[in-house]
């Protein structure tokens, strides 16, 4: 079975590289990444359909909501990432997982496994 593909939206280059490495280390494949909303929408609109997306909540003052909406409409599970907990999370995303930065490998591994688990 091919590794699950993860898309990452993160505006800080060093954190993006770290997260890409961590995702690979956990046995997943990087489907793609973006550092801003427009870049993410462009890539995802080109036919890319990852198995899951990790979305940083606040991209230099801009919410990642449009990317989340696009992914949800496409049936792609998402996990939000934030250095500030759920602050800035739109009410409509209240039930979604929010991982706290800095990344904890065990928590990330658990969140990815749960989000990618087939429905029972």
Residue ranges and their predicted role:
Residues 79-81:
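Hydrophobic/aromatic residues positioned on beta-strands within the core alpha/beta folds
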Residues 13-32:
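Two-component/phosphorelay signaling modules centered on CheY-like receiver
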